[in-house]
Amino acid sequence: MLFQTYGDKKNPAVLFFHAMGVTGVSSEPVAKYLQDRYFCILPTSTVYCKGQKYVSKADEIRQVENYLHGQNVNCLAMVVASSIGADLAMAFLTQTKLPIGHIFFVGGQFAQIGKGTRRMMTPFLYLAIKSLYWSKGGTLKKILWCDDDSIKPYFIAAGENLTYTNLRRQISDSLEDNPFPSLPEELQRHIYFEFGSIEDHFKYRQAVKEADPSGHYPVFEGYDHMQYQIRDPKGFAEMLAYIAEHDGMPKLLFIRK
């Protein structure tokens, strides 16, 4: 893995888990608005690191834990996970011994997919991600609701370093067809599972609610997948800071009543 940080180590730490097909620096626009108050840690999965070999989800978590220990991070103010980053983040949450203040899932990819289906998906995912590199971001609109120039570099960098073997290994132990983990109730009360009302991932919301009924489930009315994070990183960062500091969602006009 590769790690980038923003802010002073003396400040409360915020750990980001990134979406599929992008590097960890994709959270940079948000981190820049938090760095005055927080120590932001942006790992890039081994899958998108040149010359590195993806071993397993457990190994990814081990690398994150080792990095946090090396940075003398003994607690996390917040964990933020976008899209498929939710899969790795959930595994991290069930294993880490670090105290965590709040967790925010952005359009979490909580699919439970059979092994055979995941195996068949791999070549299509590989071509989709590599095409973003080959076309310099030109194919982004075919796989995402937007093709903003501001986010293309993260896809291009990820596609450049991606190998088929690493992606196959990642998909083999991600989005597994297992019961969704139920986290401790005390932790659930500090978790936010956000979905846009028009995004495809909205379909996972009910299953997550059944597993973690004490969590918070804000719906961003009229928003697509990760739209608030992409289009308004400052507003998104301010929302995260509000949650961390006030233990509740700010009053945003687009949150479904």
Summary of predicted features, one role per range:
Residues 5-50:
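Conserved HGGG/HGGXW glycine-rich cap/lid loop of the alpha/beta-hydrolase fold
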Residues 41-78:
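Active-site loop/oxyanion-hole signature of alpha/beta-hydrolase fold enzymes
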Residues 80-89:
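Gly/Ala-rich beta-loop-alpha elbow adjacent to hydrolase catalytic centers
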Residues 94-95, 100-131:
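Flexible "cap/lid" loop of the alpha/beta hydrolase fold
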Residues 116, 132-185:
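Conserved alpha/beta-hydrolase catalytic His-Asp/Glu region
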Residues 172-210:
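Conserved serine/cysteine hydrolase catalytic core
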Residues 212-226:
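Catalytic histidine neighborhood in serine/cysteine hydrolases
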Residues 223-235:
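Catalytic histidine-centered segment of alpha/beta-hydrolase-like enzymes
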